[in-house]
């Protein structure tokens, strides 16, 4: 879970196609090592997908070695977005969950679930972006798997 705990811009990166993320101005720099300074996530911490003004998530819960749950955050305030106070148009909210489950002796399965709710006027946006998000998230998971299997070690900085 150490690799997942450090997800985000200005942290460990997103472990995906860095050059594509940066074409979109995300300023992502992926690392292949565990960064001790990004391992202690707390509820309310912000996980950015790019610089100020880009989408971001707020940590809902973080159990080291077990789970990480994120929810969309307001790009201006960093506060979690509430579905119950949403406007009727131009609104979306996402949750992103990472769960580690024992799979076998010396093996772990990383489960990822994303949920997205949006107003009907934004349905066309998500029809365009969901396939791209799938490709990027698949690359992220493959990279996390490769790094975990290689036994990424903690390096003191």
Task: Annotate each predicted stretch with a short phrase.
Residues 79-138, 142-146, 155:
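Beta-strand/loop substructures that line and gate deep hydrophobic ligand-binding cavities in soluble
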Residues 1-43, 147, 154-157:
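Hydrophobic ligand-binding cavity/cleft-lining segments
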Residues 37-102:
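A contiguous catalytic/ligand-binding core that recognizes phosphate-bearing ligands
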